[in-house]
Amino acid sequence: MKKVLALILVALMMLSLFACGKEKPVEYQPIDPADAVSHKDHTSVYSEIGSKVTIDMVEEDKETGLAYVTVDGTKYELGMDFLSMAMVYNTAPVGNKTSTDVYNEWWKLYIQRWNYLVPEVPLYSNQYFDLYNAKIEGLVTTPYWGPADAIVAAKVKTGEANSVILGSSTDLSGAFRDSAFGKSSPGASDLDIQKLTSGYDTLMSDKNGEYNWNMSALAEVPTSVVNEDGTITYTIKIKKDLVFSDGSAITAKHYVAYALANSTPVSVAAGATGNAGLKLVGFAGFAAYTGTNNGETTDKGVTVTKYFDGIKLLDDYTFSFTYTADYAGYYYSIVNAAASPVPLALYLGAKGDVIVDPETKACGLNDAFYATEQKDGKDVYTVAAEIVANLKWNSALPYSGPYVVSNYDASSRTATLKLNPKYPGDDARGKASIETITYVKLVDETQMDMFQKGQVDIIAQITGGDQTKAALKLVDENPEKYAETHYDRAGYGKLGFRCDFGPTGMTEVRQAIIYTINRPEFAQTFTGGYGAVVHGPYYPGSAAYLATKDTININQYNYSSDSAIAVLEAAGWIYNASGKKFNPKKDDVRYKKLSGYELSEDNLNFKSVDNKYKTVKIDGAYYMPLAVNWYGTQPNPVTDQLLTAWQNNPAATTAIGMYITYTSTDFNKGIYGEFCRSKEDGYDGTPKLNAVNFATGFNSAVYDFSFNWTIDPDMYDNYSTAYIMDEADFFENYKK
C-alpha cells in the first residue's frame, strides 16, 4: 500500500511540474545515414516523351502558370529540364504557328515555371554605364557587346600613348585559354581575356547578339544537309592562309581538336566534362573509348569506337559535324556549325594528333593521346597532366586572336596583352590597332579615384546610384577628358540558391525568401533610379519577352511576411525544435518534418555554419530547421545592402521563423568553392552554402538553357545552373 501511495505521489508531482510549464526535454536520436533517400532512376520525362509532345498539346494552369501534358493516358507536369529542352528542340511549326511562335510559347512556359520555383531572387536590373578616357575613339558597347569586344575595333587618338587599361571588379584567375574548363560557367574577367586572345571563329555574334558567319576565316558559307536518317550534317571550309600568333598554320585539324579531345576520358581526367560532342552522331561510342577497347560493348549496350562518326576531316581545310536526329531541329541551328581553332597540343599533348579513318573520314585521336603511366599505383592518362599544364596562360602555346597574353601577375590580378600582328581581323570586331591592353582589378570604393589618376582607362558596367551619379558628374565637368556610353542591362544582380541542399532545396523556402525582400525598394536604393526589377531570367528588350509580355503569367512576389508564412505553413514548416507545433510567440525557428526525397544524406546532416541549428531526429522522424547559410561576396555594395534588407530585417527572419547566417567571402571562394563545390577553389567536401549573391547576364540573342536543368547525375555538377533537379522531370514519379 505504501508503494502504491508513493507512486501516486510521484505521479501527482510530475503532473504538478508539467502543469507549471516544465516539459520533459526532447531526446534527439543519432543521425542514421541508412535513412537517406535518393532517386535510383534518373530517366527524364523529356527523354521518354519529348518527341511525342507538340506545343498545341500543352495545358497551362491559368492560376499558377505551370504546364501539363497528357501522353498515352498519363498526365505529366512539365519540369525545367523538359521545358528548357523543348524550347529549342521542339519548335517545329504547328498549325498556323511559325517556329518562332512555338519557341516563344515554350519560352513563356519556361519563364513561368522558373518564376514559380524561384531558383534565385532577381534583386535589380539596371542601366550600365561604361566610363572611358576620351582618348579612345569608336568605343561602342551594348548589352551584348562589352568593352572586351568593343576595344578591338576602337582606336587611340593620334599623339596619345597607344595603350589602354581595362578594369573589372571580377577577379582574374589566369584561366585565359579556356575560362570554362572544369567549371559550370566561366569567370567574366577570364572570359574577357579569352575573347581578346581568340579568333578565326567560324561564327561570331555582333553588337546585337545575333550570330553571323565570319567570312574572314571561312572560304565559303557553310552548308547543311538533312540526311535520310533524320540527322543533319554541317560542312565547313576554312581559308588556307590562317595562322596562330607564332606564325604556324591553322588547318581543319585545329578546328576539330577541341570537340574530339573533350569527348574522351582523358579530358575528364584533366577536369573537363567530357561532353563537348554530346549532340553529335557516335558520341557515346567514342566517349567510351579508352585507348584499348575498340569494338567492345559497354554495360549500356554501346559499341566502343576509336573514331567519332559525327566529326569528319574531309581534307586539310574542310571538316563536318553531324548532329543526331534529336538535335537536328535545333531552333538556333546556325550555331551547330560554330568552331574555333586551338593549338593541337593544348588538348592533345605534345605527341597527340588527330587521325582519320581513310574510308569514312571520321576522326579519332592517336594512341599517344591515350597513353597511360603508373602514378601512386594507378594507371593514369599521361596527357591529362599535359592538358592542365598547357591551359596555363604562360604555357609555350600560341594564341589565335587579336592579342596575346604577355604577362599575368596573380598577386595583383593584372594581365598584360600585346597586339598580335599576325591576326588580320574578323567580320564582327574588325582589326585591332591598340598596341597594349592591361586588364586590372577594380574595387568599387577606389575605382573612380584610379580612373582620374589614369590608372584605368575604361570602367565597365558601372551600376549603383552613387557610382553612376559620380561617373556622369565627371563626364559633365570634363567632356574633353572623359566620355561614357550606356545601355539597359541584359541581366540582373541576384541572390542565388543552392537548390539541392538544406531549406533552400525546397520551393516554398525560396518563395518565402523572395516575399521577404523588398525588391523594388532594393533596386531603387541600389541603382539610384537607374534600374528596376525583373521577375525571372529575361531581358525586357528581348524578342521573346516582347512577344509574350501581354500573356505571360508571373508572380511579382510583393513584399509580405504574411505571404511568406502562408507558403511555409502550407508546405509543412509548422514544427519547432522539439517536433511540436511551432509557436511564434516563444519559438525562434520553424522546422519541417522531412519526407520522401527531402531525406537526402546532405539534408540529414544539414546545420547552420555557426552550429546553432541542425537537422534533428525525434522518434524516428527528421526535422530540418529553417536556417539559411548565406555567403556574401566582398567587397560588394550588394552584400552590404542585403545585410540590412534581408539578413538583419525582422520581416525576413523573426517574423517568419527563419534564421540567416552570413559568411563574408571573396568571389572565387564563394562562387566556385562553396556554390560550385570546386575543391581547387577551396571546397572542403562538406556542403554548407545555401545562398550567395552574384549576377547573371544574357550576353547573346541565343537564349538556350538546355542541359542546364538536367537530372542526369553524370552531367549535373558541370551543367546545372542552380543545382536543382526538378521532381517533375523524373519519369519514375509517373510510373503506376
Regions found by a protein language model. Give the residues of each.
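Aromatic- and charge-enriched surface segment that lines or borders ligand/interaction sites
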Residues: 100-101, 220-285, 314, 320, ...
